[in-house]
């Protein structure tokens, strides 16, 4: 119809938006659209803006503690300059700590935190913010809570000790223009309270005032809920996924594994693990047993018609080229052999009679290290790699975010996925090309 009406690209987009909104409602449509955009644009391998800090310039204003009275700031430039100084003053310390009560859509503060977190892994950031308590759109036709997650994920990946906690409120009312100073930044020697439009701020330096504000912030922080559970070691990751799989089995809910690369860890054999796990790895034998047990549970109890596994053509190619799976750090094991790579892909395809395999019909190449999602209706986690190729597992704790991912995967349109015949044809073509390429290289 859009083609018949000879609509411009912008008119076609608006027309299709209106059509889908009529079908499913505005909140559901924009929530699903927000999840899709998050997945398509996600990458924690590329830093945001490059900030070059000159200590002499940053130190122009004296913000050390012990002063009397307050310092007012007027205008966005002066407020942002004060924020930069506070962040910089803590980030250069060996054990700096920044406590912030700001919304994730404050791009200036979030980008600074990411940059300083990358520069100083010992930096601790406590972040308290408000999640929207309803499905109404706040701005730009986006789901507000998912937009918050999108802003936060790069800081999760920057390497510092980042602790994000949330509370619920009506965001529109919470940050309206009649709130005096809804935002707060706390450091060792200073506290900066500022307005939602970043036009006005007050700097506090008196120790008695700072002590009271720290106690209040810590009290609020403890009352709030953690946005995610971060798992930084192989052992904690294995323990978490094992628990999650047990919960998946116990639940009647459908389960979804959405990955760029096929979910192959459940197909690894004990022989493969014995051959490729690094010999010097601490707890090596325990890890072999744990991964083998995980594979056994996956094959005997998880891979059934309640399980849907999404993967991409690009992910198949990546696995064949590298011999590595997404779920484990590359320093823990050597790449799988040529024959093992072929065998794993064929074993994966053979699962189509037991589980639902869905190859994504990609219109554009996804990020090299994209967002992996494993969810059912009750719990789940996100998995991604940082710029330094460190694996980050984030257990999803916030219900509306969990529901958004689950609903998106449950409702993926047929036109976004290849048919089974197309899937088999494309994968076989990839395997044939891989074998042919390997044969050519071997004959050189």
Stretches with model-predicted labels:
Residues 24-28, 38-43, 233-244, 429-433:
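Short amphipathic alpha-helical patches
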